[in-house]
Design a protein with these regions (language model features):
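Conserved N-terminal beta-strand and adjoining loop/helix that marks the start
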Residues: 1-22, 75, 91
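NUDIX/MutT-family hydrolases
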Residues: 100-132
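Active-site-adjacent beta-strand/loop module that shapes the phosphate/pyrophosphate-binding cleft
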Residues: 17, 76-98
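A generic structural micro-feature
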Residues: 3-7, 34-37, 82-86, 102-105
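Short aromatic/basic micro-patch
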Residues: 39, 66, 110
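Short, low-complexity, charge-dense intrinsically disordered segments
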Residues: 136-158, 164-170
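A short coil-to-beta-strand element that immediately follows conserved catalytic motifs
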Residues: 65-74
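Conserved Nudix-box catalytic region and its N-terminal flanking loop in Nudix hydrolases
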Residues: 21-61
Length: 170
């Protein structure tokens, strides 16, 4: 019997500091989904809310940081009981604010993407990184000159592969 999923939409921010390290947050241990695991800041899009407004709101609620968004850099999927959540990941910049976590999270770290494997990641983020790695291995000869020096380049290269996977083409 095939499960009929309700689709949920979440947005996530890929925020890097001047060293190229990316902000990750540790979910509280009493969280319903991915308790105690690490993830990118962000959350659910409310009905009628734009991606940008939702992500700016979620990041502020979770971190007290005001951000400016750049581009969509990837997509991931999370299968929960009865809900299939699609996570749209956008790059952004911190504009102002002191990092102060809400009660949804109990820790944070600034970490290089290559070191994410040292953390117990939320399932959707772990899946996204695995797909990014696979896509970059098969597309090594593709070089985007515009982002070649950008620390977010590995994420940006994965957009097509992520979307294809969500659509079931890979």
């Amino acid at each position: 019997m095939m499960i009929e999923y309700v689709f949920g939409l979440a947005v996530r921010a890929l925020l890097s500091n001047s060293e190229g390290k990316i902000l990750i947050l540790k979910r509280s241990t009493d969280s319903k989904t991915n308790p105690g695991k690490w993830e990118l800041p962000g959350g659910k899009v409310d009905q009628g809310e734009s991606f940008d407004k939702a992500l700016i709101r979620e990041v502020y609620e979770e971190t007290n940081l005001k951000i400016e968004l750049d581009n969509v850099v990837g997509v991931s999927q999370q299968n929960l009981p009865l809900i299939r959540a699609v996570h749209i990941i956008m790059s952004g910049k911190i504009e102002e604010g002191e990092l102060n976590l809400s009660n949804e999270h109990e820790g944070y770290a600034w970490e290089f993407l290559d070191n994410f494997s040292d953390y117990e990641l939320a399932d959707w983020l772990e899946d996204f990184i695995k797909n990014r790695t696979a896509a970059s291995q098969t597309d090594e000869d593709i070089e985007d000159k515009k982002t070649s020096e950008n620390p977010l380049n590995p994420w940006i290269k994965n957009i097509g592969a992520s979307v294809d996977r969500i659509r079931g083409k890979r």
